[in-house]
Amino acid sequence: MKKARMTVDKDYKIAEIDKRIYGSFVEHLGRAVYDGLYQPGNSKSDEDGFRKDVIELVKELNVPIIRYPGGNFVSNYFWEDGVGPVEDRPRRLDLAWKSIEPNQVGINEFAKWCKKVNAEIMMAVNLGTRGISDACNLLEYCNHPGGSKYSDMRIKHGVKEPHNIKVWCLGNEMDGPWQVGHKTMDEYGRIAEETARAMKMIDPSIELVACGSSSKDMPTFPQWEATVLDYAYDYVDYISLHQYYGNKENDTADFLAKSDDLDDFIRSVIATCDYIKAKKRSKKDIYLSFDEWNVWYHSNNEDANIMQNEPWRIAPPLLEDIYTFEDALLVGLMLITLMKHADRIKIACLAQLINVIAPIVTERNGGAAWRQTIFYPFMHASKYGRGIVLQPVINSPLHDTSKHEDVTDIESVAIYNEEKEEVTIFAVNRNIHEDIVLVSDVRGMKDYRLLEHIVLEHQDLKIRNSVNGEEVYPKNSDKSSFDDGILTSMLRRASWNVIRIGK
């Protein structure tokens, strides 16, 4: 049997993980909000109309921050439509998803829901069809204590205390030709700079995210990032990254190698940020907000059909990917990659959270809620991936795929929780044919013992969970042993593993 070797030491530190790396995203899109988290009149809902079972599932994921309300949706969103008496709120055409937005949920309702799931809001402003003044008005409404037009409007709407939203996105995917109000890199750089400057006059404590490229495949990448930061470097704190992967070619081995592409993308953005830092002779670092990432491809044809042939509906079933086991493996691999860059990635948002390319699904028209395959790697990472990222030294067997060379069989990272005196090793065996023995030298962890080895595996890489039951769920494994500082773990072919040691 093949072997991989890894050395883990508490002195080999990358950075402490910012808990916001386990964030998510709720957009007014499809059934994410309506017929998702918000279903008034449903027996499963609370007095505010929010699904209690969905709230409990979100709590299982322990999501600390949620991006809202978009996404492409935000570029034609009028936030004023979603505040005040519900009966007075207008219905609007959502140009991004060819849907009807009823505005029954707005910033105040969403803030109330976020408190129920113990998350803070990451608010996006409309820089597509609107601009500086509207962004400032929204910030004033949300964060100013009172005594001004928009803060008093919030108080009149029954919300006395400000929401105190800390993180704000300056638009969404403004490099994309599909975006309402799409801009060139110079146009966006200027409006991002001026909007950021004005917003920080109102509330200097906020953190601002400038739009980076919609994916590494955009023709303007990475010149977009360089140009935008050339304008806005002094006023923003983060640059955003978005990336989705799919397996339309039905090539699993190559699909699982795409986390290597993710790593290249991240390194390129860091290099671009640091080039502008050097150019400006700045002492300030720009951090990364990877605020859209996931697997997304299953529903593409169905989505195109709905938007073309059945437009202008409330909560149409859009982007409802039902995930396979191999999708869960890539989500795990992407999480490992994000953790390895914890020194620069401070925020990340699994896109999305409920029904729309999501770990949580509610059946249509008020049916049961259930966990997708991708729920579990994210849950494990959010639960056990808190602490200091250690730099693992790995010697792994390699394989080639149709589009990638020298792909490591084993991808792994270790997290040291100093407070609990625990180390968690996350490892994916992305060899789809062979089991691999991972031998980890952890001799620096004196008096530690094996706590557990959790595994996510299935013989059928295309298997899915459903409302009728979970085919893919975590199990305890007896395939690890710990002796004299050497942790030996048998990693089944195509498996996600969480191996925990502690005192």
UniProtKB/Swiss-Prot annotation:
Gene Ontology CC: cytoplasm
Gene3D superfamilies: Glycosidases, Golgi alpha-mannosidase II
Species name: Acetivibrio thermocellus (strain ATCC 27405 / DSM 1237 / JCM 9322 / NBRC 103400 / NCIMB 10682 / NRRL B-4536 / VPI 7372)
Designated name of the protein: Intracellular exo-alpha-(1->5)-L-arabinofuranosidase
Gene Ontology molecular-function annotations: alpha-L-arabinofuranosidase activity
GO biological process, one term: L-arabinose metabolic process
Tree of life domain: Bacteria
Enzyme superclass (EC): hydrolase
Family, similarity comment: Belongs to the glycosyl hydrolase 51 family.
Assembly and binders: Homohexamer; trimer of dimers.
Active site: 173 (proton donor/acceptor), 292 (nucleophile)
Biological or metabolic pathway of the protein: Glycan metabolism; L-arabinan degradation
Subcellular location, principal: cytoplasm
Alphabetized Pfam families for the sequence: Alpha-L-AF_C
Its biological purpose: Involved in the degradation of arabinan and is a key enzyme in the complete degradation of the plant cell wall. Catalyzes the cleavage of terminal alpha-(1->5)-arabinofuranosyl bonds in small oligosaccharides as alpha-(1->5)-linked arabinobiose/arabinotriose, but does not display significant activity against linear non-substituted arabinan. It is also highly efficient in the cleavage of alpha-(1->3)-linked arabinoside of xylobiose and of the alpha-(1->3)-linked arabinoside decorations of polymeric wheat arabinoxylan. It exhibits very low activity against sugar beet arabinan.
InterPro entries: Alpha-L-AF_C, Glyco_hydro_b, Glycoside_hydrolase_SF
Reactions mediated catalytically: Hydrolysis of terminal non-reducing alpha-L-arabinofuranoside residues in alpha-L-arabinosides
Site (Important for substrate recognition): 296, 352
EC numbers, comma separated: 3.2.1.55
